[in-house]
């Protein structure tokens, strides 16, 4: 239980509940947008790869999107720059994503307008799809959205 406003009204429910559709507020201090969901990451490299496994989860609070995903690359010799789609919210600026993998080398991610682009750790050289052939990626990131 906690108090609200000057009259210290009490909320008796076990949790805060938001409506299914956002009810915008003109007051910037009002939390009026919360959403949790799933999305399926898809190849955005242009190679048309079909991931063996692709699951993604996100939480959006106001204009902040935090996500995690597991992506398993198929066996491929494709040399296009590796990337996959991000959660269903446009980002305002580029942001970094953390990637853990069984790829045998450090990887990093950059969240841009088209998705999550994968780079070798400490470099912005392209990582080819072939470099991730048969590999499992565990990805997490946070970015700002305008919606």
Predicted regions and their residues:
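Acidic, contiguous internal or C-terminal segments within carbohydrate-active enzymes
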Residues: 53-63
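Intrinsic low-complexity, repeat-rich intrinsically disordered segments enriched
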Residues: 1-47, 68, 75, 102-104
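A general secondary-structure signal for short beta-strands and their flanking turns/coil
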Residues: 36, 62-64, 134-138
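Generic structural hydrophobic/aromatic packing signal, biased to beta-strands
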Residues: 16-18, 31, 39, 58, ...
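Extracellular jelly-roll beta-sandwich "head" domains, especially the C-terminal globular C1q domain
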Residues: 50-55, 70-147
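Short, well-ordered beta-strand segments enriched in hydrophobic/aromatic residues
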Residues: 63-71
């Amino acid at each position: 239980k906690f108090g609200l406003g000057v009259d210290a009204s009490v909320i008796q429910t076990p949790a805060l509940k938001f409506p299914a559709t956002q009810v915008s507020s003109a007051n910037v201090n009002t939390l009026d947008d919360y959403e949790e969901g799933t999305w399926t990451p898809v190849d955005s490299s242009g190679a048309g790869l079909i991931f063996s496994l692709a699951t993604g989860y996100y939480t959006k609070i106001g204009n902040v999107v935090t996500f995690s995903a597991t992506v398993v690359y198929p066996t491929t010799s494709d040399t296009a720059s590796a990337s996959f789609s991000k959660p269903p919210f446009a980002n305002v600026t580029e942001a970094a994503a953390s990637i853990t993998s069984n790829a045998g080398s450090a990887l990093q991610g950059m969240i841009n307008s088209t998705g999550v682009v994968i780079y070798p750790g400490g470099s912005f050289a392209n990582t080819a799809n072939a470099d991730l052939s048969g590999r499992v990626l565990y990805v997490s990131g946070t970015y700002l959205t305008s919606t």
